[in-house]
Amino acid sequence: LSIRRQRQMCIRDSSLSLRHDGLHDIKINAALCIACGKCVRSCPANKEYGYEGYFDGFAQKKYYLGYHADNRIRRESSSGGVCKTLIIDSLKNGMVDGAYSLKCTDSFPFAQGEFYTREHIPSFGDMPNSVYHSVMACTEIDRIQPCKRLMLVGTACQLRALNSIIKDKCDEVVRVCIFCKQQKTLDSTRFLAKMMGTSVPPNLKFRPRYRGDGWPGIVRVDGFELPYSRAAQIPFGKRLWTVPGCGICGDSFGMEAGADITLMDPWTICSH
């Protein structure tokens, strides 16, 4: 989550290398390293977050059930299209001047950060549905231009990283947190592909789709598919192939990251 920031802070040479599980390693040139400690201080693994009493005020918060009024958009989106609608309509109606979120790409990891403006408003198809493999969402933060009101969209860890670099970019920030308790590595996708009777090619030239086609949706790898309700049982139910940083994060709702709105699936709404 802070790899981009660590690389920016490093005054010596550093590089990224893609691992087999889809995560990245930072490689520091030991011959040039002066042991300044900036990379260590910027890493959230070395910070303490106070989660005691985290849920105490939840009964006083407001909760809403939302979805897009267009049934086609609602069906094709991850969770009713609420997140994409917030971005698009906020830009169209002048509620924000800029928004930083994700856009779809043609190569792995099939998504990257993008800065949207009132002159550059995305369509619903321009932005990905939920992505259940690691995406370095903050690699394009240099694209964020100064604006009056900026919307940031991401998980709690992504919002924390974005918070550290937008201080001089805007007068006001609206933070939209994507509820997250665990993100997956590419090994999870490989497991799901195997369940479908296919595989993820070594060159990573494939096309995954983790949500959409109704709710909770369908997981697809190329032309193969699996109901999400079944696909989530082992990777999420057993907490397998989880990104290591998720083990130190207790801020699923993004409260410590200053979230104004948190979006999540209403998994148990029928039981209440």
Pin down the residues of each PLM region.
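Generic structural signal for beta-strand residues in well-ordered domains
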Residues: 2, 18-19, 143, 168
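Iron-sulfur-associated redox domains of electron-transfer enzymes in respiratory
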Residues: 48-272
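N-terminal juxtadomain amphipathic helix
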Residues: 8, 14-73
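Alpha-helical architecture
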Residues: 2, 35, 155-156
